[in-house]
């Protein structure tokens, strides 16, 4: 066999190193997710982890993002019920908790934290009250985990959600 050109060899090596770095980073992400899932709970291809303290809606969402997740978003009644029972166990003493739903951009048009429209709602009777003051949504820890809109600056407990890559 002919000796390879040194340029091509370096490129191959560089590509291999890049590939290894991507694999290492992917493993790190999976490891972090495993830790979250172990500390919290795993439901419907998502892991949930309850907050220790209370924060405003924005601070809560930023905290979740910093940990690689978002505020939890129940996408069905099944998810909503599972989330509420986890909240009841892990947010002892909290009446409600922030979820990743708001109408900050357009009054009355509720979207998730990524700005995408949501199709599942679980509003309490006479909610949302609306108005430009109450733009962030909290779910109750009791009953059927009904939603109510509240002032975003209010300090509440929250649960972060992490999607499990399939």
UniProtKB/Swiss-Prot annotation:
One of its GO terms (biological process) is ossification. Pfam families: Lectin_C. One of its GO terms (cellular component) is extracellular space. Disulfide bonds join 37-47, 64-160, 136-152. Residues 43-161 form the C-type lectin domain. Gene3D superfamilies: Mannose-Binding Protein A, subunit A. Transmembrane segments: none annotated. Keywords: Disulfide bond, Lectin. PROSITE patterns: C_TYPE_LECTIN_1, C_TYPE_LECTIN_2. One of its GO terms (molecular function) is carbohydrate binding. PANTHER family: C-TYPE LECTIN DOMAIN FAMILY 3 MEMBER A, TETRANECTIN-RELATED. This is Tetranectin-like protein. It comes from Carcharhinus perezii. The lineage of its organism: Eukaryota, Metazoa, Chordata, Craniata, Vertebrata.
């Amino acid at each position: 066999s002919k000796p390879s050109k040194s340029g091509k060899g370096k490129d191959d090596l560089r590509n291999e190193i890049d590939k290894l770095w991507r694999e290492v980073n992917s493993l790190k992400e999976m490891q972090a997710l495993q830790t979250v899932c172990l500390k919290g709970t795993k439901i419907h291809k998502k892991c949930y982890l309850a907050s220790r303290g209370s924060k405003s809606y924005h601070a809560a969402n930023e905290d979740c993002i910093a940990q690689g997740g978002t505020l939890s978003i129940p996408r069905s009644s099944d998810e909503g019920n599972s989330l509420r029972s986890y909240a009841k166990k892990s947010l002892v003493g909290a009446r409600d908790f922030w979820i990743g739903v708001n109408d900050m951009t357009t009054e009355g048009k509720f979207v998730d934290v990524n700005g995408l429209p949501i199709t599942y709602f679980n509003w309490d009777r006479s909610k949302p009250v609306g108005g430009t003051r109450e733009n962030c949504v909290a779910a109750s820890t009791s009953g059927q985990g009904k939603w109510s809109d509240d002032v975003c600056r209010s300090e509440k407990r929250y649960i972060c959600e992490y999607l499990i890559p399939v």
